[in-house]
């Protein structure tokens, strides 16, 4: 624990593991199963509960509570965990829960993520790398979030929903269906409002690739054919485009929710069993 500083008012329980150059601020409470990586900074009134692992060089702001019991009535109190990657920024009042013993029992957060004030990550979620949750964004249990996703402020994501990489959810949206990679969803209930062009440009996609994605998505959500035929047509036409293949693979994986689709005139939803 070379270079580690613990404020006199902080309570670090016996068994907690602290790395080097860790800073524990006033009135923090670190549970006996917690593992705090090198270079982490916990400001005042931070609570780390249960089997929680915090990656190196992460910064936790006041009143964040990490590793709390899952809000799952089926949870029987088994040994479950929360893993948070390195270089994460977790702002004031954020809550993240451990996994539940009804499945794998792990909640996982990737590296280089930012969680703004009062964001919430429920039990058994898997959040990728470089993900941003704006203020008051929340996701239900068992949600999967791909890399480089942005979830706007005040937005809510239904349990078991999958969000593909580089997707964007507008503020104060309610996402109840799976959102394809690069997709942009807005509204209550959220609908697919095109592609996250800004995110694709940030990711370095060329104009030709973006045009291919736009055309592929328009083909996928043209309801003139069954979904399996549309997927086959898109893959046949764009098999050399990795970005399009990512979307095809996402759809073929078939999660437990339907897909987030464009707001057609008849407002139909595309079933993942189509």
UniProtKB/Swiss-Prot annotation:
Location (main, coarse): cytoplasm
Enzyme Commission number: 2.3.1.129
Domain of life, source organism: Bacteria
Reactions accelerated catalytically: a (3R)-hydroxyacyl-[ACP] + UDP-N-acetyl-alpha-D-glucosamine = a UDP-3-O-[(3R)-3-hydroxyacyl]-N-acetyl-alpha-D-glucosamine + holo-[ACP]
Compartment(s) of residence: Cytoplasm
Cited PROSITE patterns: HEXAPEP_TRANSFERASES
GO molecular function term, any single one: acyl-[acyl-carrier-protein]-UDP-N-acetylglucosamine O-acyltransferase activity
Subunit structure: Homotrimer.
Protein name in UniProt: Acyl-[acyl-carrier-protein]--UDP-N-acetylglucosamine O-acyltransferase
Organism for this UniProt entry: Bartonella bacilliformis (strain ATCC 35685 / KC583 / Herrer 020/F12,63)
Gene of this entry: lpxA
């Amino acid at each position: 624990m070379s270079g580690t500083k613990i404020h006199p008012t902080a309570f670090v329980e016996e068994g907690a593991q602290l790395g080097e150059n860790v800073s524990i601020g006033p009135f923090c409470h670190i549970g006996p199963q917690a593992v705090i990586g090198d270079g982490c900074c916990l400001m005042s009134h931070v609570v780390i509960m249960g089997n929680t692992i915090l990656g190196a060089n992460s910064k936790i702001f006041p009143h964040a509570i990490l590793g709390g019991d899952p809000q799952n009535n089926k949870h029987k109190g088994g040994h479950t965990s929360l893993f948070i990657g390195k270089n994460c920024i977790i702002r004031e009042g954020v809550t993240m829960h451990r996994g539940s013993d009804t499945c794998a029992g792990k909640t996982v957060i990737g590296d280089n993520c930012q969680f703004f004030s009062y964001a919430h990550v429920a039990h058994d979620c898997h959040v990728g790398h470089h993900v941003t949750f704006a203020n008051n964004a929340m996701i239900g249990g068992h949600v999967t979030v791909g890399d480089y996703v942005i979830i706007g402020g005040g937005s809510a994501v239904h349990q078991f929903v999958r969000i593909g990489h580089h997707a964007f959810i507008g503020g104060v949206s309610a996402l109840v269906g799976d959102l394809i990679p690069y997709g942009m969803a807005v509204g209550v209930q959220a609908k697919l409002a095109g592609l996250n062009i800004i995110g694709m440009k940030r990711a370095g996609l060329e104009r030709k690739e973006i045009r291919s994605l736009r055309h592929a998505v328009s083909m996928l959500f043209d309801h003139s054919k069954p979904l399996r035929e549309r997927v086959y047509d898109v893959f046949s036409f764009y098999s050399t485009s990795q970005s399009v293949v990512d979307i095809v693979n996402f759809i073929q994986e078939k999660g437990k929710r339907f897909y987030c689709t464009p707001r057609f005139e008849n407002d139909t939803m595309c079933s993942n069993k189509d």
